[in-house]
Amino acid sequence: MFFEIALIGTTASGKTYIADTLAREFDAVVLSLDSLCVYKEINIASAKPSQDDLASIKYFGVNLLSVNEHFNVELFIREYQKAKEFALARNLPLIIVGGTGFYLKTMIDGLSEKTLESKSSLNNDEIYTLLLNIDPNYKIEKNDTYRLKKWLGIYEQTREIPSEFLKRTQKTGVLKDIEIYELAWDKEILKKRIQTRTKEMLDNGLLDEAKILFYKFDHKLKALNSIGLKECKEYLDGEISFKDLENLITIHTTQLAKRQRTFNKKFQSKALEFDKALATLRMKFSIEK
């Protein structure tokens, strides 16, 4: 029968493995909420499910765009609606999985009224300084050009404090009363998993993937400045050694995992130790079925 769960966790926590295993065993549909897996050309850097997995499991949210195409959370809302419609029509469970917690939170909390991105010539530092003075409660990374321009666009068009405008115009979310499970790892063990995965990605051709991407596309594109690719660019430009490349990807991925862990505290989730996660979720799926 149809039911839905969300499976969250940091990068390298094993979310995809758990989701794919359950999908095969219970014929479940999977919606990926990952900001890199949406791109057709990024396979290794995104830790995208294998071609075999994508062929044997009904996936949504993967291989939707080219690297030079822009997207926002509305893309995932549309993919969720498609995935749910597909699963409901066939009476199948739906697993929502991904490390980009912002997308899941927006799907639960709802979107705010649309505004246009600012066309201002102000740079990131200037917009960020303005933000700190006007709207210090609005949390944006200093290097997030897209969200900074969106923030400035709201301020220019409404003359309201953007965080208050977004709260006032927020619509109902598409996800209701969904059970959320978070894969939990000891920090040191997770760091070792990240080290291992980094080495595997390099062994599997990450540098070759990066070469092709930087040859075909503008290196300033946001997707090409993601962890794994931006370090490859530095290596290919002769700025760092191969040893530095591996170390920097590991360090930056570990820092990302820390930020993800902090963000995931916003959810009312049930913690699952990885070793026990499959057994727990198998039991749930068996009962629901």
Curated annotation (Swiss-Prot):
EC nos: 2.5.1.75
Residues reported in the UniProt entry to bind substrate? 11-16
Signal peptide annotation: none
Can the keyword ATP-binding be found in this entry's annotation? yes
Question: Positions of the region Interaction with substrate tRNA?
Answer: 34-37
Q: What class of enzyme is it?
A: transferase
Q: Which residues are ATP-binding?
A: 9-16
Please name one Pfam family that this protein belongs to.
Answer: IPPT
Query: What reaction is this protein's catalytic activity?
Result: adenosine(37) in tRNA + dimethylallyl diphosphate = N(6)-dimethylallyladenosine(37) in tRNA + diphosphate
Q: Which PANTHER family match?
A: TRNA DIMETHYLALLYLTRANSFERASE (PTHR11088:SF60)
Q: Family, per the entry? A: Belongs to the IPP transferase family.
- Explain the purpose of this protein: Catalyzes the transfer of a dimethylallyl group onto the adenine at position 37 in tRNAs that read codons beginning with uridine, leading to the formation of N6-(dimethylallyl)adenosine (i(6)A).
Give the quaternary structure.
Answer: Monomer.
What protein name applies here? Answer: tRNA dimethylallyltransferase
Q: Which organism is it from?
A: Campylobacter jejuni subsp. doylei (strain ATCC BAA-1458 / RM4099 / 269.97)
